[in-house]
Amino acid sequence: LMEALRRRDPQARFTFLGGDRMAAVAGTAPVVHYSRMAYMGFSEVLRHLGDISANLRTARRALEEARPDVFIPVDLPSFNLKVAKTASKLGIKVVWYISPKLWAWKKWRLRSIRRLVDKMLCILPFEPDWYAANGYDRAVYVGNPSVEEIDRALARVDVYLQQESDEATVEV
């Protein structure tokens, strides 16, 4: 996503929570590295509640200081809905990339989405219709980066196979 934004606007500046690849694109370090946010399971989250709270405070403070044109949360609804609330209070547009899977669980979060999220960018083609049927009409399908990467890889395999003999073997 950051690479695509950078191509559209080479002067774009990023304040972000993420990893090394994002840092390379942004040309700056993350406010919080994702390795300090990667907690799964009830007991692990419980053990790191202090870190999670500190990360949340850091994210909110970064929004207040940077005052970006747009806040783009990616998935992680438990954390990002709280940050989106801060962004919304600051008058910062919220454009969510990779919709939380509300259709599978925690549909009640839709109330917050309606209130806080200006645009939902979905990677599954049925999601905009699901959102519309549930009273949120600002969701759009933007394609799935994983599928697009697989398509590019398959295209490279096709080219390779066309160049090789009939006995070419491809291992996946």
Where are these regions (language model features)?
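Active-site and donor-binding regions of nucleotide-sugar-utilizing enzymes
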Residues: 1-164, 168-170
